[in-house]
């Protein structure tokens, strides 16, 4: 019996999911994510980027505006809805295919990127393999790390769901297991950007972008975010 098709991006491409990032606090989250992403892509100006599971559209605009050639891959045609602002006028492209076995040639993009997906895919090593197959130069992914409050994620899941409403269970990774999975395909880490020291659910619950900026600014200045921040955005480059 074949494994069920992975479609976690259908949820992250929905309007309901987008509402989690609405308002000033949500915009702060997305700004921080975009800044980290563009910094990690700085060695690859004008790169062709495949955003696997990127129907959430969180980085489509920043990538396009920075001059990258963007293709969004979704598991279903419905995942295009939130990126049609860019795909409609031809500023980006959308393709629908199996997330774990995309019908695209190997090494056909400079960079394969995937956010909001790795922790929600049951066969995540297969996603890693797919990203590595498609990337000519680098892969960029995000993941919740155990080097943070996520180490006790199960204990706080009920509280998190109470604040966020539509949160889902997710896999928390050690940095080593993510790096080892990519190493098996010839990729090594070359850039790491932990995003938040304090839980995102806490910032949502407090509801103040100004306070969130202040707290995270202080944590960054003290080196806490670098040591214990999550989710981590990781860049890995092909070796050999």
Stretch-by-stretch model annotation:
Residues 1-44, 46-55, 140-162:
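Conserved class I S-adenosyl-L-methionine
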Residues 113:
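A conserved beta-strand element that flanks and buttresses the S-adenosyl-L-methionine
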């Amino acid at each position: 019996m074949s494994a069920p098709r992975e479609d976690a991006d259908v949820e992250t491409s929905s309007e309901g999911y987008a509402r989690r990032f609405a308002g000033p606090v949500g915009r702060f989250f997305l700004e921080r994510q975009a800044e980290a992403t563009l910094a990690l892509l700085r060695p690859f100006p004008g790169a062709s980027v495949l955003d696997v599971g990127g129907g959430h559209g969180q980085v489509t605009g920043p990538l396009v505006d920075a001059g990258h050639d963007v293709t969004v891959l979704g598991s279903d045609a419905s995942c295009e809805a939130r990126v049609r602002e860019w795909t409609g006028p031809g500023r980006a492209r959308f393709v629908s295919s199996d997330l774990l076995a995309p019908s695209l040639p190997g090494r056909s993009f400079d960079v394969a990127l995937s956010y909001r997906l790795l922790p929600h895919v049951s066969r995540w090593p297969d996603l890693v393999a797919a990203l590595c197959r498609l990337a000519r130069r680098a892969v960029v992914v995000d993941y919740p790390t155990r080097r943070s409050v996520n180490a006790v994620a199960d204990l706080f899941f009920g509280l998190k769901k109470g604040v966020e409403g539509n949160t889902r269970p997710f896999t928390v990774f050690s940095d080593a297991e993510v790096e080892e999975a990519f190493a098996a395909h010839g990729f090594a880490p070359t850039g790491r950007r932990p995003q938040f020291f304090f839980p995102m659910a806490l910032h949502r619950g407090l509801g103040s972008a100004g306070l969130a900026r202040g707290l995270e600014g202080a944590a960054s200045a003290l080196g806490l975010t670098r040591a214990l921040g999550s989710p981590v955005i990781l860049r890995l480059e092909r070796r050999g």
